[in-house]
């Protein structure tokens, strides 16, 4: 399983970088610029997952990888909403992004100071999971706020897609379906992971890449 996880992470990084090159070589539209940011922050997230996978001998080492992951997730959530708004012609007001930025600031301060307070993680310990070690955490109030934010973003996108679909052109409808399908897969992964279906394995890299 360790080598499968390694291969998935590396494949995801290479795929994202190749898509980034394709977009940058064009004259980017607003939707493409949003995708570039989405792509960059997804790569940052996957690098964090890889760091956690390779260096988790101590809580401090594993936490370094987690910090990189949350930097990626913070930018990913804002870029995802912007990309969905531009690509599927959803109308997302500007103040939503301001709220996102404020939440992400609190989250990043929380995770970068997680060793010194219980607000992001209540507890952290290293577990041996066969061929690799991993960190096991218990989420605190800021951690819960982050995932409420993530759920709110995914739900908002799905609702906006549903509202806009009937009044859209054929081309717009196709784009809306793409966004709704990709967003739905990501949401499903989070739900199944929360229910413990995947055990210690977290397929979030696959979901974000899709």
Feature locations, PLM:
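Short aromatic-rich membrane-water interface segments that cap or initiate transmembrane helices
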Residues: 1-3, 63-72, 129-148
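Interfacial "cap-and-anchor" motif at the non-cytosolic start of specific transmembrane alpha-helices
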Residues: 2, 6, 16, 47-51, ...
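Intrinsic-disorder/low-complexity, polar/charged segments
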Residues: 4, 29, 53, 57-59, ...
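Hydrophobic alpha-helical transmembrane segments of multi-pass membrane proteins
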Residues: 6-26, 31-57, 65-82, 99-118, ...
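Membrane-interface helix-boundary motifs at transmembrane edges
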Residues: 22-35, 85-96, 162-175
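Membrane-interface interhelical loops and short amphipathic "cap" helices
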Residues: 51-65, 123-136, 198
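Membrane-interface elements of multi-pass transporters and channels
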Residues: 54-58, 87-91, 117, 124, ...
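The cytoplasmic-loop to transmembrane-helix boundary for the fourth helix
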Residues: 85-141, 173-183
């Amino acid at each position: 399983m360790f080598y499968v996880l390694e291969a998935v992470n590396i494949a995801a990084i290479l795929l994202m970088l190749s898509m980034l090159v394709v977009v940058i070589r064009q004259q980017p539209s607003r939707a493409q610029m949003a995708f570039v940011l989405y792509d960059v922050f997804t790569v940052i997230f996957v690098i964090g997952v890889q760091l956690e996978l390779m260096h988790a001998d101590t809580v401090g080492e594993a936490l370094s990888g987690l910090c990189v992951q949350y930097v990626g997730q913070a930018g990913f959530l804002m870029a995802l909403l912007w990309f969905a708004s531009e690509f599927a012609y959803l109308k997302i007001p500007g103040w939503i992004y301001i709220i996102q930025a404020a939440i992400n600031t609190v989250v990043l301060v929380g995770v970068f100071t997680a060793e010194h307070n219980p607000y992001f993680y209540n507890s952290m310990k290293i577990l041996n999971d066969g061929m690799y070690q991993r960190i096991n955490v218990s989420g605190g109030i800021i951690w819960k706020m982050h995932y409420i934010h993530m759920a709110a973003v995914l739900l908002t996108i799905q609702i906006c897609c549903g509202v806009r679909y009937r009044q859209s052109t054929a081309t717009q409808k196709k784009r809306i379906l793409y966004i709704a399908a990709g967003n739905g897969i990501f949401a499903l992964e989070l739900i199944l992971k929360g229910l413990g279906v995947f055990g210690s394995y977290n397929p979030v890299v696959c979901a974000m890449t899709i």
